[in-house]
Each structure stands twice: as structure tokens, then as C-alpha cells.
């Protein structure tokens, strides 16, 4: 009986503090992170490519995309001045480039989803949804964005040397720093 109770306790703790690490052996010693990436390789997070922002049905604030029409990285947020949600452009210019010919013949499953954490009601749409209210994602960390040899359109990293968010539109990097 003691073994069953102990096993049950560990299962509940594992479900409650679910964390995912990609590219590293274990997650950081913090309960405030739901998803983090290894920081030893010059690799980034590739955002989903969409034909245009209007093709994203049911977007919620926090949704991030690479818009093939505008060739820009965008995220969906609440704009107080407009009292509504808007797509915010994270790319400096629209000179991006992306070759989507390989994807054009593929069949898409618009309801495909992976979620980390406790699922919300109503269901939140997205390819990868971080469900927890009190946890965050740690972007892939790189010493310098320029160490990524062949970045893909829609790639995001955090440059630890310059302490900035870097997004790639297919041609140029854009930088966000506080």
C-alpha cells in the first residue's frame, strides 16, 4: 500500500510540474518554465508558416507566425489604443524570402495540436500550445545570432551576448532589446 501511495504521489507531481526540454538532458531547476531548449547549438525555434495572418482561424493573444504573404514574423496581441487584438510585426522590413514549394503539395491537418500543461476550456488553437498560466518558454539561447549558418524564415533565438530577441524573415534579422 505504501508503494502505491508513493507511486501515486510521484505521478501527480510529474503531471502538475510538467516541463519539456529539447536539446538538453534535463530541465532547469525551476518550476516557472514549461518548455526550454538546449543552449549549446546554434539552432533556433522555427515558427509555423501561414499563407497570411487572416488564414489563422481563432488566433489568441500570444500566437506567433511567419506570414508568407508579407514575409514577416508576427505575433497576435491586445492593442489598448484600438481596444482589440491585432497582429504585431516583429520584422524590421518586408524584404524577407521563403521558398514554400516543398510544402505546397503536402496535406495540412489544421486541427493538429500539441499542448504542454493543463489543457484549457475552451480549447486554445495552435500547433504548439503552452497551457499553463504560471510558466513560460525559454527560447533557444545562442552566443551570437550570426553563429546560425543557414537560418530559416521565421526563426527565433535569444542572443545571450547582446541580450536581445532575434527574428529572421528569410533575408534579414530583426532585433528586439529592452
Predicted regions and their residues:
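Bacterial Sec-dependent N-terminal signal peptides
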Residues: 1-23
Amino acid at each position: 500500500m505504501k508503494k502505491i501511495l508513493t507511486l501515486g504521489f510521484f505521478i501527480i507531481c510529474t503531471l502538475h510540474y510538467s516541463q519539456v526540454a529539447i536539446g538538453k538532458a534535463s530541465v532547469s531547476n525551476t518550476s516557472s518554465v514549461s518548455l526550454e531548449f538546449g543552449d549549446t547549438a546554434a539552432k533556433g525555434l522555427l515558427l509555423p508558416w501561414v499563407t497570411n495572418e487572416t488564414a489563422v482561424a481563432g488566433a489568441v493573444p500570444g500566437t506567433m507566425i511567419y506570414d508568407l504573404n508579407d514575409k514577416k514574423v508576427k505575433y497576435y496581441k491586445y492593442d489598448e489604443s484600438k481596444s482589440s487584438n491585432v497582429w504585431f510585426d516583429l520584422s524590421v522590413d518586408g524584404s524577407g524570402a521563403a521558398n514554400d514549394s516543398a510544402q505546397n503539395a503536402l496535406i495540412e491537418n489544421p486541427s493538429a495540436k500539441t499542448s504542454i500543461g493543463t489543457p484549457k476550456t475552451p480549447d486554445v488553437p495552435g500547433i504548439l500550445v503552452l497551457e499553463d498560466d504560471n510558466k513560460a518558454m525559454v527560447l533557444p539561447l545562442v552566443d551570437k545570432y550570426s553563429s546560425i549558418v543557414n537560418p530559416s524564415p521565421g526563426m527565433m533565438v535569444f542572443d545571450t551576448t547582446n541580450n536581445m530577441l532575434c527574428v529572421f524573415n528569410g533575408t534579414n534579422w530583426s532585433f528586439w532589446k529592452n
